Amino acid sequence: GIRDYYASRGLGDVYKRQAIDCPVYDYSNHNRSDKVQHIEPAPVLIVEGILPFVEPELCAMFDYKIFVDTDADERILRRLVRDVKERGRSLDSVIEQYLTTVKPMHEAFVEPSKRNADIIVPNGGENTAAVEMLAHHIRNLIEKANMM
């Protein structure tokens, strides 16, 4: 994803409003695929992921840093369903990975990175008031950019 692109080539092109071809991660093979996602410059660019606020250089490129916080139980349930149904993994392998890698890494990197956010949205995407407020602000930014 975009963090992989940043790590390997730098996010500077996106920041300078230049088009990029971003590598696509293949979760079934645990590696980058041969595919790329072409990203055109836009008045608003939304970078999503679990680690965008870990790197200070990356944080400095964002006008707004929004952390969508989701309950730990919800995160593990989503992971179980996704990895078993969509990625063909066994329940045991998902639980093992969660306990040995995902949970410790979340606690070591993701959770502390919330400090770098400008806004923390509790209750994930279920927080209708926050989602509507952010959508309204993003629409205003796009309209303002289109007037220039």
Predicted regions and their residues:
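A generic local structural motif
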Residues: 1-3, 31-34, 51-53, 106-108
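Single conserved hydrophobic/aromatic residue that forms the stacking wall/gate
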Residues: 1-15
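Glycine-rich, often acidic-flanked micro-motifs
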Residues: 9, 16-38
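Short, structured coil segments at secondary-structure junctions
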Residues: 10, 61-62, 116
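Short gly/ser/thr-rich secondary-structure transition/capping motifs
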Residues: 24-33, 45-50, 100-104
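ATP-dependent NMP and nucleoside kinases share a basic, alpha-helical "lid"
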Residues: 32-87
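NTP-dependent small-molecule kinase module
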Residues: 40, 81, 103-148
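Anionic, Ser/Thr-rich low-complexity intrinsically disordered regions
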Residues: 67-68, 73, 89-97, 103, ...
